């Protein structure tokens, strides 16, 4: 499955799933609405994507009863479109993909970057590397594992040590042809498969996405300690 796609014919959109509640942050609001340097994490994330010239449109998937999204000043940007999120990340992403497919005549020309709402430290340099991938397998940003990784037993004792030389930590954006990813997600959901990211759906469908080495500061704000780190990384770009 290595059909080349000419980069000159591709059109790129972004889908940002932002319907989660972020319970691990132990805050009174979803993590994407926490403020860093006067802007929400979501605003930082959207600003990076809006500033990348190859992205034509950003589909933002939010919860139907989201009480915070109306305060986002970027909602009036002509490139941003809201869609209702689903009960899972995969459902939210699929809703975003379907919104694109229903709005264009030929979705075969479109590729999508799916990016976490709570990953605000993305750089355009990493996006430049990601868009170099040309075949239907697509690609994801990722970093090689550097820590020693242990496989655990059910009682949290060590079972054995993994060979980290072949292990990578997945990041986002994850970059795929829209039609191919939509089909892969639909198949995975229909089969009840655990889809933790878009690449896993593509893997279930028989594709082998490329790993593009990203930056270690492209962190996802998931736990309270991540907040201070993101605050530091974002302070360098002010």
Swiss-Prot record:
CDD domains recorded: CDP-ME_synthetase
Name the record gives this protein: 2-C-methyl-D-erythritol 4-phosphate cytidylyltransferase
UniProt-recorded Gene Ontology molecular function terms: 2-C-methyl-D-erythritol 4-phosphate cytidylyltransferase activity
Entry's EC annotation: 2.7.7.60
Highest taxon of source: Bacteria
Catalysed transformations (reactions): 2-C-methyl-D-erythritol 4-phosphate + CTP + H(+) = 4-CDP-2-C-methyl-D-erythritol + diphosphate
Gene: ispD
Entry similarity comment: Belongs to the IspD/TarI cytidylyltransferase family. IspD subfamily.
NCBIfam families membership: ispD
GO biological process entries: isopentenyl diphosphate biosynthetic process, methylerythritol 4-phosphate pathway
Site features described as Positions MEP for the nucleophilic attack, chain residue numbers: 164, 220
Phylogenetic classification of the source organism: Bacteria, Pseudomonadati, Pseudomonadota, Gammaproteobacteria, Pasteurellales
Site (Transition state stabilizer): 24, 31
Organism: Pasteurella multocida (strain Pm70)
Pathway annotation: Isoprenoid biosynthesis; isopentenyl diphosphate biosynthesis via DXP pathway; isopentenyl diphosphate from 1-deoxy-D-xylulose 5-phosphate: step 2/6
UniProt keywords, alphabetically: Isoprene biosynthesis, Nucleotidyltransferase, Transferase
Role of this protein: Catalyzes the formation of 4-diphosphocytidyl-2-C-methyl-D-erythritol from CTP and 2-C-methyl-D-erythritol 4-phosphate (MEP).
């Amino acid at each position: 499955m290595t059909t080349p796609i000419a980069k000159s014919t591709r059109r790129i959109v972004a889908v940002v799933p932002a319907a989660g509640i972020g319970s691990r942050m132990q805050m009174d609001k979803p993590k994407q609405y926490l403020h860093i340097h006067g802007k929400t994490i979501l605003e930082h994330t959207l600003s990076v994507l809006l500033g990348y010239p190859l992205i034509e449109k950003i589909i933002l998937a939010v919860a139907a009863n989201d009480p915070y999204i109306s305060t986002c000043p970027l909602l009036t940007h002509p490139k941003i479109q809201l869609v209702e999120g689903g009960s899972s990340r995969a459902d939210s992403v699929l809703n975003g993909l379907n919104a694109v497919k229903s709005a264009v005549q030929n979705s075969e020309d479109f590729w999508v970057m799916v990016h976490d709402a709570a990953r605000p430290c993305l750089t355009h340099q990493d996006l430049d590397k990601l868009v170099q991938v040309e075949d239907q397998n697509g690609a994801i940003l990722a970093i090689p594992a550097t820590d020693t990784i242990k496989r655990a037993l059910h009682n949290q004792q060590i079972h054995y040590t993994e060979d980290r030389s072949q292990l990578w930590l997945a990041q986002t954006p994850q970059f795929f042809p829209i039609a191919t990813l939509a089909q892969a997600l639909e198949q995975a959901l229909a089969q009840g498969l655990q889809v933790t990211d878009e690449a896993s759906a593509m893997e279930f469908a028989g594709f082998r996405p490329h790993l593009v080495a990203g930056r270690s500061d492209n962190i996802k704000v998931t736990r309270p300690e991540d907040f201070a780190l993101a605050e530091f990384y974002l302070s360098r770009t002010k």
